[in-house]
């Protein structure tokens, strides 16, 4: 991309998005002023209301799925009935509807060679004090906290010819995370920047060439977006992509749980937590993908660069030595007769300078007179390349024209350190996504999900001995699975403006039975340009 394009992108973000952003920040600041100041990260005694969290959560669930839709219907004009026509795969009932005249702030040109759009996403979260017998350097703070994250993106693209396009996105991310993003395997906000020291200046998010090779003459309709500008594609085709992108753009995609702008926001609800996919701390890698698509199935492969260190911003530019391989098979066939569904099978292998938990534990235990300050350190090793591998299953099934069920399962070998995504070695997630057309609010949607995360035995021992991962480290560990319930309701306010209250309940945060449970309410404001 030329310097002139970068300058134009930055100016557009500043001139168009900035006034709206400042108004939203004012709203968040007013809401925050009604709460007490943020506390320190000390130990909090167990409150007497802990036993009542479960019934309170049940009441909140009932409220969200019964009262909020009715309120939304009263506050806005009813929309037209949902169009559930599909070209391939399941109906994306929880996705933004295709009527772009009301979905975005400004209309998108459907027949143009060019693409220009944008988005701004703000997520405000807080949590009250929760019980914690102790806290460590990488714990979720047990006292009251509040934080607001933001992500703004300018999407641009140009179709070079009938089979090739160039896609370039400029992004800006900032704000803050609860406890700077530490203490949870299933973090409550996927939009947070995991390294608070990164520059707040706009950066290149995506920049790639997309090439399509036709393998059949018949065509299928394609919905234009920032990832593909084509109006139609060959039914049987090979798609190649080269450049900078995020692997979840093309792998482990789920129509119910993959998008923090309209759907869930927990890390392990929107993505497979055990998929330690190649990425820098902002979630992007450099590499290539190959995607073969046929009538009711597809197979894709991706090769991407890995970071230098866990959660690092710099990638290792030696793909013959440090790299990640990803494979996914997709079958577009439902398990319920006459209802559409999809099953996706994922496998991956990473090669990087990763430490081994067992080696760190042995090194720690071999000290003849360990001091209280001595803890195992999985990063204390010479440069070497180790292998990490895992697999995942991604399932979605239409139940009605307005309701879709989803499930994910993931596993990795758990021997090498968690390196690029989060500290999960096994995960299971299930949930429901509903389209607001069910209650005559076509652009609204709602969802509920349950996630259960776990780590391997060596990983448990490492944390119990006081070791620190790049996200977890309470100084000790009374191990238990980290179980999460998440609900949300996204309401369309006007044109491209959406708001979404949400709630997450987390048992055994950071896999520690000596801490929690914790309740995290949230409020999301989203603008589509």
Q: Which residues make up each language-model segment?
A:
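Outer-membrane beta-barrel "beta-signal"
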Residues: 205-218, 448, 517-529
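Outer membrane beta-barrel transmembrane domains
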Residues: 330, 346, 350-385, 406, ...
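Residues that define the transmembrane beta-barrel architecture of outer-membrane proteins
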Residues: 112, 146-152, 200-205, 282-286, ...
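Surface-exposed coil loops of outer-membrane beta-barrel proteins
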Residues: 182-199, 203-206, 216-324, 328, ...
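Residue-level signature of outer-membrane beta-barrel architecture
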Residues: 122, 158-160, 170, 211-213, ...
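N-terminal periplasmic/intermembrane-space "pro-region" immediately following the signal or transit peptide
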Residues: 21-24, 31-32, 65, 70-144, ...
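Short loop/turn motifs that connect adjacent beta-strands in outer-membrane beta-barrel proteins
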Residues: 104-116, 128-129, 158, 162-166, ...
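Transmembrane beta-barrel strands of outer-membrane/channel proteins
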Residues: 120-126, 168-172, 240-244, 301-305, ...
């Amino acid at each position: 991309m030329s310097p002139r394009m970068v300058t134009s992108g930055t100016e557009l973000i500043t001139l168009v998005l900035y006034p709206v952003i400042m108004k939203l920040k004012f709203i968040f600041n007013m809401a925050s002023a009604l709460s007490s100041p943020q506390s320190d990260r000390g130990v909090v005694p167990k409150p007497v209301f802990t036993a009542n969290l479960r019934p309170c959560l049940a009441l909140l669930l009932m409220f969200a799925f019964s009262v909020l839709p009715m309120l939304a219907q009263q506050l806005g004009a009813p929309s037209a009935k949902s169009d559930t026509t599909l070209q391939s795969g399941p109906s994306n009932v929880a996705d933004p509807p295709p009527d772009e005249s009301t979905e975005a702030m400004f209309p998108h040109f459907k027949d143009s060679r060019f693409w220009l759009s944008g988005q701004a996403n703000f997520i405000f979260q807080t949590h009250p004090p929760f019980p914690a017998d102790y806290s460590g350097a990488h714990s979720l703070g047990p006292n009251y906290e509040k934080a607001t994250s933001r992500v703004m993106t300018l999407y641009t693209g140009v179709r070079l010819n009938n089979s090739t396009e160039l896609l370039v996105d400029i992004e800006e991310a900032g704000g803050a995370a609860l406890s700077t993003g530490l203490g949870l395997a299933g973090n409550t906000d996927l939009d947070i920047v995991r390294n608070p020291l990164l520059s707040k200046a706009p950066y290149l998010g995506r920049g790639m060439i997309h090439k399509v090779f036709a393998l059949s003459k018949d065509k299928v309709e394609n919905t234009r977006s920032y990832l593909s500008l084509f109006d139609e594609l060959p039914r049987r085709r090979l798609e190649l992509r080269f450049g900078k992108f995020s692997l979840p753009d093309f792998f482990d995609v789920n129509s119910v749980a993959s998008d923090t702008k309209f759907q869930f926001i927990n890390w392990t609800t929107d993505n497979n937590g055990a998929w330690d996919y190649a990425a820098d701390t902002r979630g992007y890698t450099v590499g290539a993908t190959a995607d073969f698509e046929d009538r009711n199935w597809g197979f894709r492969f991706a090769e991407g660069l890995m970071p230098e260190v866990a959660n690092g911003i710099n990638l290792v530019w030696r793909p013959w030595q440090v790299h990640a391989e990803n494979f996914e098979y997709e079958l577009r066939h439902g398990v319920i007769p006459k209802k559409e569904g999809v099953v996706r099978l994922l496998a991956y292998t990473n090669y990087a300078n990763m430490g081994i938990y067992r080696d760190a534990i042995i090194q720690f235990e071999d000290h003849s007179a360990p001091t209280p300050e001595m803890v195992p350190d999985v990063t204390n090793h010479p440069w070497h390349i180790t292998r990490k591998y895992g697999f995942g299953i991604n399932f979605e099934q239409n139940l009605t024209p307005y309701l879709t069920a989803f499930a994910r399962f993931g596993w990795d070998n758990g021997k090498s350190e968690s390196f690029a995504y989060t500290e999960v070695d096994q995960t299971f997630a299930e949930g429901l996504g509903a389209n607001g057309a069910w209650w005559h609010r076509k652009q609204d949607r709602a969802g509920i999900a349950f996630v259960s995360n776990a780590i391997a035995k060596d990983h448990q021992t490492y944390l119990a001995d006081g070791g620190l991962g790049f996200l977890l480290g309470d100084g000790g560990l009374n191990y238990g699975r980290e179980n999460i319930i998440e609900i949300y309701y996204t309401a369309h306010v006007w044109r491209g403006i959406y708001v979404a209250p949400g709630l997450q309940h987390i048992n055994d945060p950071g896999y520690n039975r000596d801490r929690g449970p914790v309740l995290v309410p949230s409020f999301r404001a989203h603008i589509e340009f």
